[in-house]
């Protein structure tokens, strides 16, 4: 249980740092930061649930009437922190979306006002049409494929597509990292449980041969698990390499 609690504290500290970064740069924060916060929130929620399950199982095994106040306070604190982090991230995300919408609205409005107030805009437009007239006649097919968008708008749209793709890849990588950390942490917990079970079997008078056969079986299961994990990581690597 202490290992789970320490892991939850580590995730909580990471969330505090990421939320502080998001709050400090609420307008210019990258989308990948939001993905990282979402992944850490999911991992923390999973850890809190596992901690609660361990406490209930410990209570049933020891036939205790109530959970130790120390562990109960830890669970209550983690649950409250998770709720606060989720609410804060929701508010920051809403503020980020509102600022984005306001910036886009003011940007488009300002560009229209500048065009209408500029006395030379009409003459410049005519000159541009004269200069581009010959090229547009030769490039009708290209402009029709582009949906009539100006070149800079097309490039901006393409850049936004790439940014969204990179954000998704960063989110996938962050999820993979969190999953790997959870797997390593669970493996440590299982190793400790195995040692305790072996000591318990020796205390009960079970022969060393039986304990050795059980440990061999556990080792085979571990070997299969690690091979599957390595194959999974290799598969994720090639998928990401293909997507990039």
Curated annotation (Swiss-Prot):
The keyword RNA-binding does not apply. It comes from Saccharomyces cerevisiae (strain ATCC 204508 / S288c). This is Protein transport protein BOS1. SNARE required for targeting and fusion of ER-derived transport vesicles with the Golgi complex. PANTHER family: GOLGI SNAP RECEPTOR COMPLEX MEMBER 2 (PTHR21230:SF1), VESICLE TRANSPORT V-SNARE PROTEIN VTI1-RELATED (PTHR21230). InterPro entries: GOSR2/Membrin/Bos1. Belongs to the BOS1 family. Disulfide bonds: none annotated. The chain crosses the membrane at residues 223-240.
